[in-house]
A protein has these predicted regions:
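N-terminal helicase ATP-binding lobe
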Residues: 1-146
Length: 146
């Protein structure tokens, strides 16, 4: 078994087994994300700077986002991550994907779409305990303007 760990706690580590390897990160469930070098490289790059990830369907853009999110939530314990998706169904899909692999309680995750009334949206934005928000761009724009 080869255990690769970076000096900085912000970096993703992985455990290499003869038949498979998995991402090891305190906020990611054990053996829930298989390690892929290209995803790890993109995630490490995206952690330090703005990054546009363009990959064909089913090559793991969501996994890269989960890896970056896990590191941000772990290293910045009083901050929140905003995940923006163009449609409500995609917001819900991302929320389910993140929740299935991240060790984060459901009360720390929120969804804000056009179906969320204004008062609950304000409560979500003001709730410091919510660490992960999934929203559509229109709602974010409208709430910033109000």
């Amino acid at each position: 078994m080869l255990d690769i760990r970076k000096e900085s706690s912000r970096m993703i580590t992985y455990d290499q087994h003869p038949d498979s390897c998995y991402i090891i990160q305190p906020l990611i469930y054990e053996k829930s994300i298989e390690f892929r070098t290209y995803q790890n490289n993109i995630a490490e790059s995206a952690y330090d700077k703005n990054t546009l990830v363009v990959l064909p369907t089913a090559l793991g853009k969501t996994i890269v986002a989960i890896m970056v999110t896990a590191n941000a939530l772990y290293n910045y314990k009083h901050k929140r991550v905003l995940v923006v998706a163009p449609t409500r169904p995609l917001v819900l899909q991302h929320m389910r994907s993140f929740y299935s692999v991240l060790k984060i309680s459901q009360d720390k995750i929120a969804e804000i779409t056009g179906k969320t009334p204004p008062l609950p949206r304000t409560a979500i934005w003001n709730n410091k305990d919510i660490r992960l928000v999934f929203a559509t761009p229109e709602v974010v724009r409208n709430d910033l303007q109000d």
